[in-house]
């Protein structure tokens, strides 16, 4: 069955264009118009993705090393691709409408001229955007609800310090229950979420999952499915996985403590909880994360937090 033509889906799903062509041939004029609109939105999503890529490249010189790793760039690329797809699906840029209006203007339809004029005005608004303001645009799209809630989207934390200050009370409580340093939990949450900027989102907003704990068979609560990066034989691979969703950040910290205490594979690591380095390397070896440098990264972030 053909996908809903109003659903742009994943930006690189170019094979769907052949389905649009077949639909146009089989269903006559109505199918042709429907396919035209869908193809225009596909083109707009690709154009928008290219524009966002240019913005990111223009802004690279202003980014710190800790927020500009390969993992960060990978998730940022996924965010931009999904943003481009969603903006096109919602008609937010107006480029698709302008394309359709131009291609149908010869039919003498006054509505086409109006749509073309409105779309042109909308497109001009975006062409005037300064590439250096990419982050501000991204934030505004999230606040206005234009950005997909199923993607990794920035949260309210505007700096590493604000993330640490907000999470510190929860981390201290969880660290006491677990018997580890609060700074270690803060570091792990910071690494997993990019200082709170990449918390997995669900239909209601944030999943509040600070430790990216997946929703396995034992999980009976809410969950959200999204793309993630896993390492196989030290090679990063994009995968789709279900993650746990919580009502608030406190629940996320509480579940992290339960997750480690109730899982036998972390028993050896928990016996070394008095030594932060041994503990984080222990849960890493036990399979908490597939990134081969995960423990080293957590410890580096921990040092940064302790120097704040």
From Swiss-Prot:
EC number from the UniProt entry: 3.2.1.-
Subcellular location(s) per record: Periplasm
Extra remark beyond the main annotation: Probably exported via the flagellum-specific export pathway.
Main location: periplasm
Primary gene name: flgJ
Species for this entry: Vibrio parahaemolyticus serotype O3:K6 (strain RIMD 2210633)
Protein name per the record: Peptidoglycan hydrolase FlgJ
Gene Ontology molecular-function annotations: amidase activity; hydrolase activity, acting on glycosyl bonds
InterPro entries named in the record: Flagellar_prot_FlgJ_N, FlgJ, Glycosyl_Hydrolase_73, MGlyc_endo_b_GlcNAc-like_dom
Biological process (GO), any one: cell wall organization
Keyword Hydrolase among record annotations: yes
Purpose of the protein: Flagellum-specific muramidase which hydrolyzes the peptidoglycan layer to assemble the rod structure in the periplasmic space.
Pfam hit, one: Glucosaminidase
SMART domains: LYZ2 (SM00047)
Cell wall biogenesis/degradation in keyword set: yes
Name of the top EC class for this enzyme: hydrolase
Similarity annotation: In the N-terminal section; belongs to the FlgJ family.
Keywords for this protein: Bacterial flagellum biogenesis, Cell wall biogenesis/degradation, Glycosidase, Hydrolase, Periplasm
Enzyme active site: 230, 255
A single GO cellular-component term on record: periplasmic space
Region described as Catalytic: spans on this chain: 159-308
